[in-house]
C-alpha cells in the first residue's frame, strides 16, 4: 500500500535503513535485505501519512493531519512510546527539529492552521502563531515559512517566540510545498504549479 511521504534514509544500529509510510503505518526497512526492522501502526483519515518521520539518535517522531496528532518513540527491538498527543498535526509537510524543539504547522489546509513550537522531550506546546496553514524549512537556525496564501517570512528558530523579520507575498494560494533553499536560491511553489525563484545571495 503506497504512502505519501518520501522514503527517509537513516542509520539505525549502525546499519542503513529507510523509513517509509503507508496509509496505515510508518516502518523502518533494512536497505541490505528489505527486512522490516520495526513497524508503527499509524492510521490517519483518508490514509494520508504524508509528513516525513524525523529521527534523532534513538528516537523517531511522526505526525499527520486530520487531528491524528503526533508522537515520539524510542527505537529498540520494539518502539516504545515516549509521548503522544495532538499538539502538532502535520498534514502535508514534516516539522523541523532545531535543538530541543520542533517547529511546524498544526492543522489542515483550508482550516485555521497555526505555526507551533513544540518541545521534543515532552510534546508540550511552547508557543504558537496564527499564520494559517503553510509549510516551512530551516537554514542557519532560521525558519523559512511559506503560508498557504503565499506569504513568505523568515524568523529566528527560537523557543522564545516567532518574530519574523519581514513578510512578502510571493505566490497566489494554495501553497502546500515546503520552500527549498539551494546555493542561495529559494524556490517556492503553489498547487497550480507556479514556481518562483528568489535570489538570497548577497552582493551577487
Task: Kindly give the residue locations of the regions a language model identified.
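Short loop/turn segments that connect beta-strands within beta-propeller blades
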Residues: 30-34, 74-78, 119-122, 156-160, ...
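C-terminal hydrophobic structural anchor segments
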Residues: 126-164
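Extracytoplasmic beta-rich repeat domains
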Residues: 1-15, 39-56, 63-67, 83-97, ...
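Short loop/turn segments immediately following the C-termini of beta-strands
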Residues: 21-23, 65, 107-109, 148, ...
Amino acid at each position: 500500500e503506497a504512502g505519501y511521504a518520501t522514503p527517509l534514509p537513516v542509520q539505525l544500529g549502525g546499519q542503513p535503513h529507510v523509513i517509509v509510510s503507508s496509509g496505515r503505518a510508518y516502518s523502518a526497512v533494512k536497505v541490505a535485505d528489505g527486512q522490516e526492522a520495526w513497524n508503527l501502526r499509524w492510521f490517519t483519515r483518508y490514509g494520508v501519512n504524508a509528513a516525513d518521520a524525523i529521527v534523532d539518535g534513538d528516537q523517531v517522531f511522526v505526525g499527520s493531519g486530520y487531528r491524528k496528532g503526533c508522537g515520539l518513540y524510542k527505537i529498540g527491538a520494539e518502539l516504545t512510546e515516549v509521548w503522544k498527543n495532538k499538539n502538532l498535526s502535520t498534514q502535508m509537510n514534516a516539522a523541523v527539529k532545531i535543538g530541543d524543539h520542533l517547529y511546524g504547522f498544526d492543522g489542515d489546509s483550508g482550516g485555521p492552521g497555526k505555526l507551533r513550537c513544540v518541545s521534543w522531550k515532552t510534546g508540550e506546546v511552547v508557543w504558537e502563531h496564527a499564520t494559517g496553514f503553510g509549510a516551512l524549512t530551516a537554514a542557519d537556525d532560521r525558519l523559512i515559512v511559506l503560508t498557504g496564501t503565499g506569504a513568505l517570512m523568515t524568523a529566528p528558530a527560537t523557543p522564545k517566540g516567532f518574530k519574523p523579520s519581514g513578510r512578502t507575498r510571493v505566490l497566489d494560494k494554495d501553497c502546500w510545498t515546503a520552500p527549498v533553499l539551494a546555493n542561495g536560491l529559494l524556490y517556492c511553489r503553489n498547487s497550480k504549479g507556479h514556481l518562483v525563484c528568489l535570489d538570497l545571495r548577497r552582493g551577487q
